[in-house]
């Protein structure tokens, strides 16, 4: 290559580098990792419009995938949406950066009651802020449950599914439960008046006995199939997530198939879960990450997300901006009285997790 050509190429390379550097300076980015289909249709577009920051957005479909990515290597992400249940593991591993609340002017909008519950997984609310949240309860076919149990069916109580006499009748029209020992065993313990996050093996023996007694009347354990089956009338009762039950209700209404679905948050109390916004300790763009988190704490930003997804957010100031039909639906926004009965789930010691895994295998197999 001639010296002249080398000089030309060097000049072009220099120009290209300068151009790319200028472009990078003009177009800051933030890398976000979220659950699939878990944001408003215009949120990312509006964030770029309002801040000038380009969101690079990827999705995952299970907490195990998220934890695997964050705990085994540098992920390259700035902000991730992590469940409250994952927080203790991520905090202990040193994967998260403390959030500088003083640099987040919209943190003041967070619901103090929800922050107090979240503190069970994130002491002092150092690492996470609520994004969206929900509950675990009972979805049911109004007409079929009435036909099976009469007008006084205890649809507002765990008695509906943990009382063997009730479940035997409901089993004729189909009952499904989550395939999740970490969610179902705490509910069984709570029904029995035992600590839902117990580490006592004797408590789990009692929960095992209860579930084995009920097993003949449960059609299946699955964490997704129940949505379509409930909407289509193939089952009449399911234990699962609030948003999933509302999805089944919406699907039935859109199909105009005559199936009436309702969601009940049992009066005895139930699990509450939070999906939270966290900043990674090795975030390549921490300031842009903070900007993204703070943006989602703006009331006018998060309210349309709740409307779109039918999940409540953790922002007290956003509630008046949420559509009336959404904010007045106790299946989406539980009352203060109901909220006081909810409990969070905790990661348990490995020995207890092994006990839960063994019990769940026996329950699913019916032996």
Which ranges hold each PLM region?
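Periplasmic-binding protein-like
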Residues: 204-213, 219, 257-278, 327
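A ligand-binding cleft/hinge motif common to bilobed small-molecule-binding domains
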Residues: 86-89, 237-258
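Short beta-strand->loop
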Residues: 97-108, 255-271, 280-283
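Early extracytoplasmic/lumenal segment of secretory-pathway proteins
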Residues: 24-93
């Amino acid at each position: 290559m001639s010296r002249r050509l080398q000089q030309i190429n060097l000049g072009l390379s220099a120009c290209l580098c300068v151009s790319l550097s200028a472009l990078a300076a003009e177009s800051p980015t933030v890398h976000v990792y979220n659950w699939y289909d878990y944001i408003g249709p215009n949120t990312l577009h509006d964030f770029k419009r309002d801040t000038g920051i380009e969101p690079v957005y990827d999705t995952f479909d299970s907490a195990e995938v998220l934890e695997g990515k964050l705990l085994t290597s540098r992920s390259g992400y700035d902000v991730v949406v992590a469940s409250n249940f994952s927080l203790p593991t991520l905090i202990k591993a040193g994967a998260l950066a403390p959030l500088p609340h003083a640099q987040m002017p919209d943190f003041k909008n967070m619901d103090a009651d929800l922050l107090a519950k979240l503190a069970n997984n994130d002491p002092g609310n150092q690492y996470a802020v609520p994004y969206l949240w929900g509950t675990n309860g009972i979805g049911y076919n109004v007409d079929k449950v009435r036909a099976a149990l009469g007008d006084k069916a205890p649809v507002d109580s765990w008695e509906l599914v943990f009382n063997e006499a009730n479940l035997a009748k409901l089993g004729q029209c189909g009952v499904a439960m989550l395939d999740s020992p970490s969610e179902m065993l705490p509910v069984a313990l709570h029904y029995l008046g035992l600590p839902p996050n117990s580490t006592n093996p004797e408590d789990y023996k009692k929960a095992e006995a209860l579930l084995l007694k009920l097993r003949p009347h449960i059609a299946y354990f699955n964490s997704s199939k129940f949505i379509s089956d409930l909407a289509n009338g193939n089952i009449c009762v399911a234990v699962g997530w609030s948003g999933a039950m509302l999805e089944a209700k919406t699907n039935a209404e859109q199909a105009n198939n005559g199936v009436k679905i309702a969601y009940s948050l049992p009066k005895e109390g139930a699990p509450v879960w939070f999906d939270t916004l966290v900043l990674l300790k090795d975030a390549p763009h921490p300031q842009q990450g903070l900007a993204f988190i703070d943006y989602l704490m703006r009331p006018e930003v998060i309210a349309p997300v709740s409307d779109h997804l039918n999940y409540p957010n953790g922002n007290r100031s956003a509630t008046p901006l949420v559509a009336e039909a959404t904010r007045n639906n106790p299946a989406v926004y539980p009352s203060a009285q109901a909220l006081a009965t909810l409990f969070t789930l905790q990661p348990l010691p490995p020995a207890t997790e092994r006990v839960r895994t063994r019990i769940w295998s026996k329950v699913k197999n019916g032996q």
